[in-house]
Regions:
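Eukaryotic tandem repeat interaction scaffolds
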Residues: 108-109, 118-170, 174
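HEAT/HEAT-like alpha-solenoid repeats
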Residues: 10-24, 49-63, 88-102, 127-141, ...
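Eukaryotic acidic, Ser/Thr-rich intrinsically disordered low-complexity regions
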Residues: 212-234
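Alpha-solenoid HEAT/ARM repeat scaffold
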Residues: 14, 33, 53, 72, ...
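HEAT-repeat alpha-solenoid elements in large eukaryotic scaffold proteins
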Residues: 1, 29-39, 68-78, 107-116, ...
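Hydrophobic residues within the alpha-helices of tandem HEAT/HEAT-like
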Residues: 1-6, 23-24, 38-46, 62-63, ...
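Alpha-helix N-cap/helix-start positions at coil->helix boundaries
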Residues: 25, 29-30, 64, 68-69, ...
Length: 234
């Protein structure tokens, strides 16, 4: 990629971009990271938004690959694209891929996607981001699969890591915890217990604290011993 500024736009598009499209799908993490770290070199020669749009078929191909390890490689590329791409292009073309990964059949991908979503929120926070994410979470919270409902809670836990920025969690995400704390599956209620207990300690919002304490009282009376342990131990 370092030769792109030297050979110019036409030759970069003819020779460099086809190689990039192939190598970005390589299974070797180091190869992909070298490409991503040198994207700025391409930006000196071609319009980066046009480049990202041209990359979408490759990104789609990776995200739909039958091999879950291949699908799991896409995070670092998405994070970089979020940093360098026009916001509108990202939300229209790449955000749907990020959202879809939250319901991937493989746990490792769902878990990694939860962490990625928090990184993306820190970079792109705004009403458009919150609306897209919450629309997906509403659907996931109603899923017949408890694993998908559990993923909602695991994602929300990522937003508890930043103890000094709880506004989005309290206003938009906490209602999901209130609902799922009554889930029929103990594992879901157990993870909700962790969130409720920690948020009760961290929040400065009186209404949120009151709701947390009400949920704590309910969860302490849960029929499952692991749920009771989670709400009393955290």
């Amino acid at each position: 990629l370092s030769v792109a500024p030297k050979i110019g736009e036409a030759r970069t598009k003819e020779y460099i971009l086809p190689l990039f499209h192939e190598l970005i799908k390589d299974e070797d993490h180091d190869i992909r990271m070298v490409l991503i770290k040198n994207l700025d070199k391409l930006n000196e020669v071609i319009n980066i938004d046009s480049f990202v749009q041209g990359m979408l078929p490759s990104i789609d191909e990776i995200s739909e690959n039958k091999n879950w390890r291949t699908r799991n490689q896409i995070e670092e590329t998405i994070i970089v694209f979020a940093r360098i791409t026009n916001r509108k292009i990202f939300f229209e073309n790449i955000m749907p891929i990020c959202i879809k990964r939250l319901t991937d059949p493989v746990y490792a991908i769902r878990r990694k996607s939860c962490k990625m979503m928090k990184k993306l929120y820190d970079m792109l926070r705004g009403e458009d981001f919150e609306k897209k994410l919450c629309t997906k979470l509403t659907s996931m919270a109603k899923s017949d699969s408890y694993l998908i409902r559990l993923t909602v809670v695991l994602l929300i836990k990522e937003f508890l890591i930043d103890e000094y920025d709880l506004e989005f969690l309290e206003k938009r995400l906490f209602p999901y915890i209130s609902k799922l704390s009554n889930d029929k599956i103990p594992n879901v209620r157990q993870e909700c217990s962790v969130v409720v207990r920690k948020l009760e300690r961290l929040s400065k919002n009186r209404d949120v604290i009151k709701e947390c304490r009400s949920l704590i009282d309910e969860l302490k009376r849960d029929k499952d011993i692991e749920v009771v342990y989670a709400i009393t131990d955290n």
